[in-house]
Each structure stands twice: as C-alpha cells, then as structure tokens.
Amino acid sequence: DPNSSPGELIEALKDADAAVPWLASIPLDVAKHLPKLKLVQLLTAGYDSVDVIGLSKLGIKVANNGGSNAISVSEHTVSLMLSVYRRMMEAWSNTKDGAWRSGVDQLPVRTEINGKTVGIIGFGNIGRQVSRRLSGFDCEVIYHDVVELMPGRDGELGAKAVDLDHLLRVSDIVTIHVPLNSSTRGMMGAREFNLMKNTAIFINTCRGPVHNEADLIKALQNDVIAGAGLDVLEEEPTDPDNPLLHMPTSIVTPHWAGGTGEGNERAVVFALSNLERVAENRTLLSVVDPASIFKLRDTRSLWLIP
C-alpha cells in the first residue's frame, strides 16, 4: 500500500527476502530495518523511484523488469510519431465536433513517416524495439548511446551509431529512451532543441524530467521544432493549464505507454523468476549496477536502460 507508514512497511517486510513495490518505494529508513531483504524487484524499466546506491550499501540489490514492457513502449512511441505527423488530435476534434474536414485543409500538410531519419537517444531494450518497428516504414535509423553495441549489431538492428549533436541536427524525429538519473535530468533543453530542424518532432516515452519542459514549450511556441508527442511530463498528473495540453502541435498521453496487458504479464512473470532465484540463491537477472551509477552520476553517461 503506497499509503503505508514506515512502521507498517517494516512490519510487513520484516521476514521478506525480496520485495516487489508497486506504486510505492522502499525508503532507506525502512530498508535499514530489514536485515533479511536481498532484492527490491521493480516492475518497471526505470529505477528512479528507489535509491539504488543507498540500498546497495545495505546489501540490497535492485532489479528492473528486464525489458518486459519494451514492446508496449516501443509501439506507443511509434503511435505518437504517427499521431503528431498526421495531426490526429485535430482531425478527431473536428470530426467529433461535427466540422468534419472544415478548416483541416488549412492546417500544415500532414507528413508521412516513410523515408524519414529517426534519431534514437538511448539504445537499450526499448530503443532497439523502436528501431525494429521503424524498419517497416523504410526509415533511416540512427542512435546515440554511451554503451557500444557488439561489433556487427548495428547492421543487424538496422541502425547506425552517431554522436548526439549530429543526431539532433539531422533527425526528422528525435525519440528518447533513457533512465532518469542526475546525468540525464534535463538533457533535452534549449540548446538541444535549437540544434534540431525546425521541421523535426520530439518524442518522449521514458521519463518527463529528461526534457526541460519550459524549454520544450518555448521551442514549440517559437516554431523551433514542429511538434512533440509525450507520454511523460515533469510533474504527473500535470496542471490542466499546462500549455502542452493546448497546443495543436503536441500530443500528451498519461504515462501509460508500458501499461498493456501483455507487458504487465511479462513484468510479473519476470519478477517471479527473479524471486525464485533469490529463494534458490542463484544469480539475479537485470540487476542495476550501483557502481556504474555512482561513477557516472555526475556525467552525461549512464543512458542505457538495461
């Protein structure tokens, strides 16, 4: 229960070898009273809801969902690309309001995704699934990630590694798939939006704070970029007066890209497999490396979602 007090959590988990928080966290002031706890198993790809480094100092490992929601998030990502390009929200509003196509023909020409250059920032489980889904659209896919793929994997996945600034300058669509930590918070800001084409669109289905929302709003208002498709925002739920909800060039969904029945089932199955590994004292899967976070947390380096 996310509303449980620290005392209630300690009582509930005092004999647990593993915990699977849902819509809640395991605070350090609770974890330090749980000497048997070995694993905090997350059902999400992101791990910003827990203090990985602090838990590791207590001998507790943190594992994410092992890419269980990668297909769900990648499908939602591509749907946002298409929706922004084809002005779906405006078309729906016109149709629903009985205007049909009246006024729609005066909108900027809708755009095909076919043949466009798509830049993927963060080429982990989700980024790679996005690349696979774009292959059917004959897109040129480029990516940036600090973790190099094994030789030959670029061609296998139909993507080419480039530096970040080049990706921003040449991409028609920029989509970001990184974990939220101190190195990625605000990594898409005014400088980055100004590097993008004024015809380019920005997609974010990972974590809201990786983009600077005020800078994104200004970029859209001033036609620095052409559009945005967002499943995440800096504050959730957002203020109903948030300009991003009222711009014809932006589409916002309520942080549910990964929330499909299939994705949820895979996440639960993966979590159960790791719980079995704890019970059998076997090697755990998809454990977040605290040493890497500690080493790289003050750089722009730890981008790959395991």
Where are the regions a protein language model picked out?
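An N-terminal-biased, well-structured beta-alpha scaffold segment characteristic
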Residues: 1-63, 189
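Phosphate-binding beta-alpha-beta segment of Rossmann-like dinucleotide-binding domains, i.e.
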Residues: 58, 65-117, 129-132, 151, ...
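Rossmann-like dinucleotide-binding domain for NAD(H)/NADP(H)
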Residues: 62-63, 199-306
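Hydrophobic/small residue at the entry helix of a nucleotide-binding pocket
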Residues: 126
